[in-house]
Amino acid sequence: MKPARLMKVFVTGPLPAEGRAALAQAADCEVEQWNSDDPIPRKDLEQGVVGAHGLLCRLSDRVDKKLLDAAGANLRVISTLSVGVDHLALDEIKKRGIRVGYTPGVLTDATAELAVSLLLTTCRRLPEAIEEVKNGGWSSWSPLWMCGYGLSQSTVGIVGLGRIGQAIARRLKPFGVQRFLYTGRQPRPQEAAEFQAEFVPIAQLAAESDFIVVSCSLTPDTMGLCSKDFFQKMKNTAIFINISRGDVVNQEDLYQALASGQIAAAGLDVTTPEPLPPSHPLLTLKNCVILPHIGSATYKTRNTMSLLAANNLLAGLRGEAMPSELKL
């Protein structure tokens, strides 16, 4: 009997061990992979997907009409190693009948932990304090030296009370937060009850919060949501944290708000673009802490994500139910 033709799978970069092992054990697939941790150049990506039945990509890989055309009619499954899907041309993908897998849920805890870490790092001015120790600035003591802001008796505003937003609130509550506010597309009374969180207009959230954490999805409605008008409503003692997507924030307006003292400080795990150029004005500010999009970066989480992404891909190729399929 003639052996069945193998299905071509293209992977846009090295995977953690669990996902790599799942693909290696797939006897019905022929796996090709870009073997560098650096982002795959566009030309190599377009060449790599030619004739592929499945594509396993990253958040940094733009899957648009041109790439889909390059892949051709064989492409039936795209699995992304992310919960975000704003890098995927979903309308075009749906038009072609291609299934999409993603990795929600598994990164919630790690991302919430990072959000709280970033908030504490920013509000207590830890990078500044570390630098003072290193450069000899720790020469004496005075009552207000290196003072920051505490969470006890504070008001925390969360933009987007989804899985990650709830996990952040759950971790902040034991710090003695007095009041939680949230905003989003619609009230979520069942989820909000755990924190006695109040659903309010975004202008009220900006004006009344001591700490603001942005954890919403990037959509046409949230693009540029946090801009000049938003920052002008914030307290000058307020801390702004973004762990969602860079495009939710107008970074020029944020820079002006920070540089002028309109708001106290900001912590960002996401920027536009990524990576952020070392010459970017935000990096000149002591009151702005920027991380390289490491929200889900724990060994356990990344391994779990890679296994889920691999299983999504394989199930889709075999015509089976995906563990986590995006409904288009």
Curated annotation (Swiss-Prot):
Sites bearing Phosphothreonine, chain numbering: T298
Enzyme class, spelled out: oxidoreductase
Record SUPFAM superfamilies: Formate/glycerate dehydrogenase catalytic domain-like, NAD(P)-binding Rossmann-fold domains
Keyword flag Oxidoreductase: yes
Keywords: NADP, Oxidoreductase, Phosphoprotein
GO cellular-component term (any): cytoplasm
Family annotation (Pfam families): 2-Hacid_dh, 2-Hacid_dh_C
Any one GO MF annotation of this record: glyoxylate reductase (NADPH) activity
Single GO biological process annotation from the record: glyoxylate metabolic process
In-chain residues carrying the UniProt-annotated modification Phosphoserine: S36
InterPro entries (alphabetical): D-isomer_2-hydroxyacid_DH, D-isomer_2_OHA_DH_cat_dom, D-isomer_DH_CS, D-isomer_DH_NAD-bd, NAD(P)-bd_dom_sf
TM annotation in the entry: none
Catalytic residues as annotated in Swiss-Prot or TrEMBL: H293
Site label Raises pKa of active site His, positions: E274
Subunit structure: Homodimer.
Family: Belongs to the D-isomer specific 2-hydroxyacid dehydrogenase family.
Role played: Enzyme with hydroxy-pyruvate reductase, glyoxylate reductase and D-glycerate dehydrogenase enzymatic activities. Reduces hydroxypyruvate to D-glycerate, glyoxylate to glycolate oxidizes D-glycerate to hydroxypyruvate.
Protein name stated in the entry: Glyoxylate reductase/hydroxypyruvate reductase
Organism, as annotated: Mus musculus (Mouse)
Gene this protein is translated from: Grhpr
